[in-house]
C-alpha cells in the first residue's frame, strides 16, 4: 500500500514524505548506498517494472542494500491525525499509531453485525439494528408465544392464527384469525353471495330484494306462446323475434306497407302481397333516386367558387394539344364559378388548338353564362367586366412574371349575355360565349414559362357587382 492518506493536524515534514507517492511513508525502507527513503510498497512497485535504479538519484540499486527504517517509522507513527470518520462527526485526534485502537471503539466505524447477517453499519447504529432490523434477531409472537428469527417473524406477523382480528366484511365481529374463514362463509351477515339467476354477487342481507328485480329472473311470456319462462331482460327480444303469437309489422314497412299481424301469419301476408310490395319498393327507389340527384346538385353548388375569380389548371397540356389537333373544335371546359355569393354562374372554355380565326395557330378562350340558382335576383343582361390571364409560371424571385391579359365589357345586345333559358346547353356557335379566338399564338405560349411541368394556368376574374335586385 502507498503512504498514509489521512487528515494530519499539521503538515508533515518533507523528509517524512515518500518521493514516489508524496504521502507520509508506510513501512519506510532506506537505500543504504544513497540514503533515500521510500514506502516499502511504492519501491517494490517501482522496481517491479524492471528499473533497478534509485528513483531519486538514478544510482544502481541492490536488493541487499535496502533495509527497513524503524526510526523514521516511529516518527511517522507519531504524527497527530484526525479520525477517518471526522467528516461524519467523530472528534477524536491523536498519534497515527493509536488510530487502529481508536477505530476498535469508534462509534462511527463500520462493523459487521454480530448476528452474522449480511448488514455492515456504524457501531452507533448497531443497537437499533439488533433490536428492530436484523433478520437474525430473536422475537416471540405475543399471540401464540412461538419464538422466531427476525426474518421468519415478518412472515408470521399478520397471519398468526391465534391473533384476534375483526371481520373483513366490517360486520363488527371479532375473533381469532383461525375462525375467520368459517365466519366469512356461513355466519357473517355482510358476506357476499351469488344471485341464483345472474352472475353478480351481493351482500347476504340484500340478496332477496335483488332477486325480485334481477334482470335474469324467469318470467312467463305475456302472450302465453308456450315457451315456459324467459329471463326478464330477454323478454323484449323474445316478443320481437321468437314469440309466435306476438304481433309484428310487415318487413316491407320501410317501403310503405302498414300491415300488422301475428308472426305466424306474416309469411302468408308476404306471399300474397308480392306485387303491392314490389310497387312500393319501386316507388321508394324512385324517390331515393330523386333525393340523390338533388343532393348531388347541392354538393356541386357548394363546391363552386363564389369570389368572382377562377384559376383553372389545364394539365397534360402536350397530350391534350395533340388531341385538339387531331379533333378540330375540341373544347375544354373549366369548373363553373360564381361572380359572388348569390351571383352569376359562369364557365370558361378553351380550344388548345384554336377556334375560328385562331384555329391551328392560337389558343382560344371564351366565357359563357350558365343557368344559376339565383338568376331571378340578378340584373340582366350580364354586364360585368371580364379579364382573362394566361399566367406566367416563372419564379417571381428570378424575374417579374409577364402574364398575358385581355379584358372586355360584355355587349348587352348579344343574346349570350341575356338571362339563360332552358334552350341553352348545346355547343353550337350561339353557346360559345364571348372571348378571344387569338388569345396567344402557339409560338408565344412556348416562350417564358407559360407552360411548366406540362400544365398551363388560366385566370378569369369578374368585376364584382354592387348589389342584387331587391
UniProtKB/Swiss-Prot annotation:
Keywords: Apoptosis, Cell junction, Cell membrane, Coiled coil, Cytoplasm, Cytoskeleton, Developmental protein, Immunity, Innate immunity, Isopeptide bond, Membrane, Metal-binding, Nucleus, Phosphoprotein, Repeat, Tight junction, Transferase, Ubl conjugation, Ubl conjugation pathway, Zinc, Zinc-finger. Its EC number is 2.3.2.27. GO terms for cellular component: bicellular tight junction; cytoplasm; cytoskeleton; cytosol; fibrillar center; nucleoplasm; nucleus; perinuclear region of cytoplasm. PROSITE patterns: MATH (PS50144), ZF_RING_1 (PS00518), ZF_RING_2 (PS50089), ZF_TRAF (PS50145). It is an enzyme of class 2 (transferase). Its main location: cytoplasm. Pathway: Protein degradation; proteasomal ubiquitin-dependent pathway. GO terms for biological process: apoptotic process; innate immune response; positive regulation of JNK cascade; positive regulation of protein kinase activity; proteasome-mediated ubiquitin-dependent protein catabolic process; regulation of apoptotic process; respiratory gaseous exchange by respiratory system; respiratory tube development. SMART domains: MATH, RING. Changing residue 263 to R: Abolished ubiquitination by the SCF(FBXL2) complex. It catalyses: S-ubiquitinyl-[E2 ubiquitin-conjugating enzyme]-L-cysteine + [acceptor protein]-L-lysine = [E2 ubiquitin-conjugating enzyme]-L-cysteine + N(6)-ubiquitinyl-[acceptor protein]-L-lysine. Residues 307-462 form the MATH domain. A zinc finger (RING-type) spans 18-58. Residues 277-310 form a coiled coil. The modification Phosphoserine is found at residue 426. There is a cross-link at residue 263 (Glycyl lysine isopeptide (Lys-Gly) (interchain with G-Cter in ubiquitin)). It is found in: Cytoplasm; Nucleus; Cytoplasm, Perinuclear region; Cell junction, Tight junction. Polyubiquitinated, leading to its proteasomal degradation. Ubiquitinated at Lys-263 by the SCF(FBXL2) complex, leading to its degradation by the proteasome. Homotrimer. Interacts with LTBR/TNFRSF3, NGFR/TNFRSF16, RPS6KB1 and TGFB1I1. Interacts with SMURF1. Interacts (via TRAF domain) with MAP3K4 (via kinase domain). Interacts with NCF1, TICAM1, IRAK1 and TRAF6, and is probably part of a complex containing TRAF4, NCF1, TICAM1, IRAK1 and TRAF6. Interacts (via MATH domain) with GP6 and GP1BB. Interacts with EGFR (via C-terminal region); this interaction promotes the formation of EGFR asymmetric dimers. Interacts with PKM; this interaction promotes PKM kinase activity. Adapter protein with E3 ligase activity that is involved in many diverse biological processes including cell proliferation, migration, differentiation, DNA repair, platelet activation or apoptosis. Promotes EGFR-mediated signaling by facilitating the dimerization of EGFR and downstream AKT activation thereby promoting cell proliferation. Ubiquitinates SMURF2 through 'Lys-48'-linked ubiquitin chain leading to SMURF2 degradation through the proteasome and subsequently osteogenic differentiation. This is TNF receptor-associated factor 4. The gene is Traf4.
Amino acid at each position: 500500500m502507498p503512504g498514509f492518506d489521512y487528515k494530519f493536524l499539521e503538515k508533515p515534514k518533507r523528509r517524512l514524505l515518500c518521493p514516489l507517492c508524496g504521502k507520509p511513508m508506510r513501512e519506510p525502507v532506506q537505500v543504504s548506498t544513497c540514503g533515500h527513503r521510500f514506502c516499502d510498497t511504492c519501491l517494490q512497485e517501482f522496481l517491479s517494472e524492471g528499473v533497478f535504479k534509485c528513483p531519486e538519484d538514478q544510482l544502481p540499486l541492490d536488493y541487499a542494500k535496502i533495509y527497513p527504517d524503524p526510526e523514521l517509522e516511529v516518527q511517522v507513527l507519531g504524527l497527530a491525525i484526525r479520525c477517518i470518520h471526522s467528516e461524519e462527526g467523530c472528534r477524536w485526534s491523536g498519534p497515527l499509531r493509536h488510530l487502529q485502537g481508536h477505530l476498535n471503539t469508534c462509534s462511527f466505524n463500520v462493523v459487521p453485525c454480530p448476528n452474522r447477517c449480511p448488514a455492515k453499519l456504524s457501531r452507533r447504529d448497531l443497537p437499533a439494528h439488533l433490536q428492530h432490523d436484523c433478520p437474525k434477531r430473536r422475537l416471540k409472537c405475543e399471540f401464540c408465544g412461538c419464538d422466531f428469527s427476525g426474518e421468519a417473524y415478518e412472515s408470521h406477523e399478520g397471519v398468526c392464527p391465534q391473533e384476534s382480528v375483526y371481520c373483513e366484511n366490517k360486520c363488527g365481529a371479532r375473533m381469532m384469525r383461525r375462525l375467520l374463514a368459517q365466519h366469512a362463509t356461513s355466519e357473517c351477515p355482510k358476506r357476499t353471495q351469488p344471485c341464483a339467476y345472474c352472475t353478480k354477487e351481493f351482500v347476504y342481507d340484500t340478496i332477496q330484494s335483488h332477486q325480485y328485480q334481477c334482470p335474469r329472473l324467469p318470467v312467463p311470456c305475456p302472450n302465453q306462446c308456450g315457451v315456459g319462462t324467459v329471463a326478464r331482460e330477454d323478454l323484449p327480444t323474445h316478443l320481437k323475434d321468437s314469440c309466435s303469437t306476438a304481433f309484428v309489422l310487415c318487413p316491407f314497412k320501410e317501403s310503405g306497407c302498414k300491415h300488422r299481424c301475428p308472426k305466424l301469419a306474416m309469411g302468408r301476408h308476404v306471399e300474397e302481397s308480392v306485387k303491392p310490395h314490389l310497387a312500393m319498393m319501386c316507388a321508394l327507389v324512385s324517390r331515393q333516386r330523386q333525393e340523390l340527384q338533388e343532393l348531388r346538385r347541392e354538393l356541386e353548388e357548394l363546391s363552386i367558387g363564389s369570389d368572382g375569380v377562377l384559376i383553372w389548371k389545364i394539365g397534360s397540356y402536350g397530350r391534350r394539344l395533340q388531341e385538339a389537333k387531331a379533333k378540330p373544335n375540341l373544347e375544354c371546359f373549366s369548373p363553373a364559378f360564381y361572380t359572388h355569393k348569390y351571383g352569376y354562374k359562369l364557365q370558361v372554355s378553351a380550344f388548345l388548338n384554336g377556334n375560328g380565326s385562331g384555329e391551328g395557330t392560337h389558343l382560344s378562350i371564351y366565357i359563357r353564362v350558365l343557368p344559376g340558382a339565383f338568376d331571378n335576383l340578378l340584373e340582366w343582361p350580364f354586364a360585368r367586366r371580364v379579364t382573362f390571364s394566361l399566367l406566367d409560371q416563372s419564379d417571381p424571385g428570378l424575374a417579374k412574371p409577364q402574364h398575358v391579359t385581355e379584358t372586355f365589357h360584355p355587349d348587352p345586345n348579344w343574346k349570350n349575355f341575356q338571362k339563360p333559358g332552358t334552350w341553352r346547353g348545346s355547343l353550337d356557335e350561339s353557346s360559345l360565349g364571348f372571348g378571344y379566338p387569338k388569345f396567344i399564338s402557339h409560338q408565344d405560349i412556348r416562350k417564358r414559362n407559360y407552360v411548366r411541368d406540362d400544365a398551363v394556368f388560366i385566370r378569369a376574374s369578374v368585376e364584382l357587382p354592387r348589389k342584387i335586385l331587391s
